[in-house]
Amino acid sequence: MAEEIITETNRETATDHAYGGAQIQVLEGLEAVRKRPGMYIGSTGPSGLHHLVYEIVDNAIDEALAGYCTHIEVTIKPGNIIEVSDNGRGIPVDIQPKLGIPAVTVVYTVLHAGGKFGGEDSGYKVAGGLHGVGASVVNALSEWLTVRVRRDGAEYEQSFKRGKPDGDLKKIGAAASTGTTVTFKPDPEMFQETTLYRYETLLKRLREEAFLNAGVKITLTDERPDADRPQDEQSGEMRTETMCYEGGIRSFVSYLCERRDLTPLHPQVMYMKGEGQGAVAEVALQYYDNSYNELLLSFANNVHTPEGGTHEEGFKLALTRVLNEYGRAKGILKDKDENLSGPDAREGIIAVVSVKLQEAQFEGQTKAKLGNTFIKGLVNNVVYKALTEFFEENPAVAKAILEKATQAARARAAAKKARELVRRRSALESNRMPGKLADCHEKDPSKTELFIVEGDSAGGSAKMGRDSNIQAILPLWGKMLNVEKARADRIYGNDKLMPVVTALGTGIGDEFDISKVRYHKIFIMADADVDGSHICTLMLTFFFRYMRPLIDHGYVYVAQPPLFKLQKGQTVKYAYNDDEMKLLSAEMPGAKVNRYKGLGEMNPDQLWETTMNPDNRVIVQIKIEDAERADEAFSILMGEQVEPRRQFIEKNAKYANLDV
């Protein structure tokens, strides 16, 4: 049977497709990349800068998919120069028939030129991207780029400057091996925000590639001096890491579990694989006893699809169907019970879905969502058949998963009742807003701000100091709920979170509606100490787990109250950290320094001037650049196990600014 739970690694075999100059097709010329780089790499900020590396690595990965590459080496050199080397076949150097120039020159100078467009004459069966799109775009956005090819017993070299050839292709010597080495320097004219590469960002992506391509070895090395590194990655030492996972995506799921504070519900990671219509689908999953969340990562031709697509749809459909059918057949779900919903079936799951196919159809330039319709049926069939068989052969595991899902269903029903009770109560009350909410006069959400303030004392000062036209104040009281350890039904009974839910007006979880939000700026305002930071983290965990679109839309902020007040005569200045305090003390010798222990120590005028006045305040907008890392961080920080949290804090403490 093609779809089964297996323990041995299935390895792709090398294709016998020809790969020479005749296979390099030309679709259109390379134009406008430097004029509109965002169309090709998403942005010219840090994400676009790192995307250059991914494009070159993807070419090497495609060689691995075809069965010709086993080792990829990525090196960050001094000056933030990138070198990517592989032991694949080497880019063709013979003359491309249509243009009459070497194929490697075509690949690096012509947009949509490459050997990955499918068909019998293609150089590849499947590919993560269009061969020449990545190569030529990286070339266009580099100050300079050099490609060295080892092929047919010789080594060749071609150099480029800002996308244009800097001389002809040259044969520079003999070569005992095959492969391609690309070295490039991002153009600072294009990447004006930064040209500093982050080792950790590259490491995460390359580790994903290693998991998704079982047995392929990937090495990342950072040879830069600290002066060429981001400040928080300066260590004075060269860093290197080699990754190779024979277990493939099963190892990926295990790794994701190990990085979190989770206890597996069953010992074995389930793995299933199947083929159809020239595509291959792989799924690995495991449930966790102490998790109420789901983490589903999907990939198409090694490209992460954060917005999902047809492969995710097929997986979710099959998983829910199998659990319901098995539950009914075994009497775990009674006749009176409703079917499990999708979220019920996926509570506490970590799953990786990976498909590899010809002619992948991605929605959008950044390939965030897979659109091939037949993939839904393929993944659905693979998961349905394999999981049904697994449950029959492992009834104890199946029962444990069903019991967890039914508990989730009961909690969902309880949350629904609690939600309806809150609604009925609100409908009977003349004022539906929380009693302690001091609302603003303005009704246009795009102009209004909500300050969620810890404690009645600070809340009182904030109410007196605010601009009541646009600023609303909601003091929090009672015990804060850690939602990482609780299901949604407990939120509706929490006297600290429910006022927030009611004031915002959006609902939570599946019922969340961003169009109903009453404020477009939501500030968490807590004391600048350990307790305040804990409260802030609890609130951010709640927003991330149950009101995530607020963060995605850029509506959530953390207010930054000052730590110090310096006064000399009539001159008053505020410092927001120790370094600022030292600088101001040097500027104001003899100044009286007061250290604030809490927001309540400030009078209304001071709180307005330092923390709430749009003209003066220091704020931090909460952004999620990497949802997986955010999920991991919340799981570690707010979970039950102490050791992972201690390790996380020790690793990141030097970047924190806490009054301890």
Task: List where the protein language model places each region.
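GHKL-family ATPase ATP-binding module
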Residues: 1-22, 30, 52-54, 62-64, ...
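Conserved short strand/loop->alpha-helix "switch" segment adjacent to the catalytic nucleotide/phosphoryl-transfer site
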Residues: 35-54, 125
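Flexible beta-alpha connector loops of hexameric P-loop NTPases
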Residues: 40-48, 92-98, 303-310, 375, ...
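Residues immediately C-terminal
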Residues: 62-63, 90-91, 530-531
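Short conserved segment of the HATPase_c
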Residues: 91-114
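C-terminal interaction appendages of subunits in large macromolecular complexes
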Residues: 410-429, 444-449, 460, 464-466, ...
